[in-house]
Amino acid sequence: SNLKGAANAEAGSEKLKEKQQEAAVELDELKKRREERRKILEEEEQKKKQEEAERKIREEEEKKRMKEEIERRRAEAAEKRQKMPEDGVSEEKKPFKCFSPKGSSLKIEERAEFLNKSAQKSGMKPAHTTAVVSKIDSRLEQYTSAVVGNKAAKPAKPAASDLPVPAEGVRNIKSMWEKGNVFSSPGGTGTPNKETAGLKVGVSSRINEWLTKTPEGNKSPAPKPSDLRPGDVSGKRNLWEKQSVEKPAASSSKVTATGKKSETDGLRQFEKEP
């Protein structure tokens, strides 16, 4: 049994070796095929490049050849034209010529004379143009002098800087309102109207009267509650009587004072009115 196992193992190892050898051979073949394919591709690419280069060269050669042929034909045609005698050639083979109509030479001469005359006239024109320009200049000078005279005749309007600045007048009016003498200042702005002169005088007198009015000394102060005593009925009665007597006297004095002033104000108003 041992011998059989050893024999089987040897046979299996031999088979493995054979398989390995076959695989190595296949790999070598594959490598060779790949190299062959790569070489074929490189050869094809080189062929394509060569063909393209040859095609370009052929195209350039054809262009050069065509140019040479065209130049050669042109040169031959020019030589033929130079060598061809005009008298010996028949009318059919003569080259085409553009004939001018009859009488064209006369028209050209007339046109040349007309151009010469026009050139001479144009040479004489500058003097006339200078005279016209001088007339225009003189007319422009006349217009400018007339415009300047009209401007000088018109009265000049006062500039904005000549107008009076009312800053001082505003300050004076403010101070007059603070003091109460609104219409008493001599530096008033403008002359008042005749209709409002008396009214202004009356209003100013009233304002001065209200400001300068002093409390009358005849009035006795009102009794305080602390001055009165409970039960002092006679003292209260005397105080009431005194107050009732003093009030009508003060009112009468006020009426007389205001009446006199109003009368004087009215007289002033009538005197000032025209």
Curated annotation (Swiss-Prot):
GO MF annotation list: actin filament binding; calmodulin binding; myosin binding
Gene name, Swiss-Prot/TrEMBL: CALD1
UniProt-annotated stretches for the region Disordered: 1-102, 179-274
GO biological process per UniProt: actin filament bundle assembly; angiogenesis; muscle contraction; negative regulation of actin filament binding
Major place of residence: cytoplasm
Keyword Cytoplasm: yes
Keywords (A to Z) from UniProt: Actin-binding, Calmodulin-binding, Cytoplasm, Cytoskeleton, Muscle protein
Stored InterPro entries: Caldesmon (IPR006017), Caldesmon_LSP (IPR006018)
Ranges annotated as biased composition (Polar residues): 182-194
Entry's Gene Ontology cellular component terms: actin filament; myofibril; stress fiber
Subcellular location: Cytoplasm, Cytoskeleton; Cytoplasm, Myofibril; Cytoplasm, Cytoskeleton, Stress fiber
Record flagged with keyword tRNA processing: no
Superkingdom classification of source: Eukaryota
Basic and acidic residues compositional bias, start-end: 12-21, 28-95, 226-245, 260-274
Name by which UniProt lists this protein: Caldesmon, smooth muscle
Organism the protein comes from: Meleagris gallopavo (Wild turkey)
Biological role: Control of actomyosin interactions in smooth muscle and nonmuscle cells (could act as a bridge between myosin and actin filaments). Inhibits the actin-activated ATPase of myosin this inhibition is attenuated by calcium-calmodulin and is potentiated by tropomyosin. Interacts with actin, myosin, 2 molecules of tropomyosin and with calmodulin.
Pfam families linked to this entry: Caldesmon
